[in-house]
Swiss-Prot record:
Record has Transmembrane helix as a keyword: yes
PANTHER family noted in UniProt: CYTOCHROME B561/FERRIC REDUCTASE TRANSMEMBRANE (PTHR45828), FERRIC-CHELATE REDUCTASE 1 (PTHR45828:SF3)
GO CC annotations on file: membrane
Protein name as catalogued: Ferric-chelate reductase 1
Residues bearing carbohydrate: N138, N308, N321
Enzyme Commission code: 1.-.-.-
Amino acid sequence: MAVSGFTLGTCILLLHISYVANYPNGKVTQSCHGMIPEHGHSPQSVPVHDIYVSQMTFRPGDQIEVTLSGHPFKGFLLEARNAEDLNGPPIGSFTLIDSEVSQLLTCEDIQGSAVSHRSASKKTEIKVYWNAPSSAPNHTQFLVTVVEKYKIYWVKIPGPIISQPNAFPFTTPKATVVPLPTLPPVSHLTKPFSASDCGNKKFCIRSPLNCDPEKEASCVFLSFTRDDQSVMVEMSGPSKGYLSFALSHDQWMGDDDAYLCIHEDQTVYIQPSHLTGRSHPVMDSRDTLEDMAWRLADGVMQCSFRRNITLPGVKNRFDLNTSYYIFLADGAANDGRIYKHSQQPLITYEKYDVTDSPKNIGGSHSVLLLKVHGALMFVAWMTTVSIGVLVARFFKPVWSKAFLLGEAAWFQVHRMLMFTTTVLTCIAFVMPFIYRGGWSRHAGYHPYLGCIVMTLAVLQPLLAVFRPPLHDPRRQMFNWTHWSMGTAARIIAVAAMFLGMDLPGLNLPDSWKTYAMTGFVAWHVGTEVVLEVHAYRLSRKVEILDDDRIQILQSFTAVETEGHAFKKAVLAIYVCGNVTFLIIFLSAINHL
């Protein structure tokens, strides 16, 4: 999809990469077989948790209480296996004792064959019942994986072996129970990455475009260098948390090959993962990566690794000699957890083959539909509606005798500006729905305020069609209703713009956006105050003294023509300032 989203970034940075942080709700069925959380760390070797059972012998149909206890932990996965084949499927099923802290999982198509945590809250003890099946083996052993936090976990802690009556004694050594995975070696880089070969030897993506990773700590840099049948990947950027890139068949999240570099405890962990939808990424084995290295210096994090172009038989790793959209993102991380990014990731405008001829490319942090949506809303609710309101409220006497297409000039200008506002709002309103394919559930109050603004923007011209004649008794009610709805729409629109500027899909630079929008509001309110004061001062010149009381005439008189030049000057200055604010915002959107 050429203009659809940058939602993968929404994904890349919702992640929590610890076993528990990735799956705080305990839905870890993908780990049922190996019982290994793929964190990129080695598991602990000395268990500090124990499993106890209520009896050591059992018959099919028995229910045995199983207790897991020890140091505080956040996550766990408990299973029963055939003690003579610990790599086989789970045996039997479990019954919960406290469903508030634990839940049943379906592993190997056996319902309730495993138990896991329900949340990431700390626990010191878990109790469940194990139900012995009719086909139970002679010897059954309980195994548990326990996660204390991201880099501290234990895999397949062996529990008691329970046996059926008259079974031969079980003699398999416990040492075979816990296979500890090993990690590929990681070395240290000695100098910053260079962008001098970008477009010549390296395929480079940078944010901002053409930034220098050797000189700019804020430069997010990604390069691919082909070397025969492998590709060397370099990635660098701010060391505040993590860097990531992903290869995607489209600009939507799901079925994507992602790679992460996470800064934790003065170390950088390099981790491949894959994305299966709008959910947390699934961490994969690092066995597919070679020559891994990293460096932390001067506020910059660097990581590099080598990967074969093709990996036959390896799931979730894409062949690199195919064209993909490339996502590049960075964000905060703490204790191994990656937090949602404050800005959409950069996504290339089109698909690229990183093994093809070297290129030096950029991308955009916002999808075209959302950029157009924001631009049209700024034009409508910063400029056209604001000028239209001023013209109707303060310039009737100025252009009362000037006519345009058979109507008073002020009225025609007001009507054209308000009609333009309604049309722009209608066009902009549908764009997020087209982009999201429906309602946006992650945009806070912004879409709700937008719907209110859209409704009022459509009702205003419909109401104007039924405007009563000038001297009709209902005219005053119309005027108040028209003014109230218009004022409400403008206030809500400003609130929606404030909120919309912070949404990931159109996240304008933090350093100035709030000040600029506040400046626009102050500019408009200040102009209205100046014109109100000016109108009041003119009205004082036509006061009528009646029984020692001053009555202010509500209609303008010929005396007010003295201020026409002043009003026109104020309007000209206001329009220049308004357009300046508009250009600032439109320029910022264009550079996303």
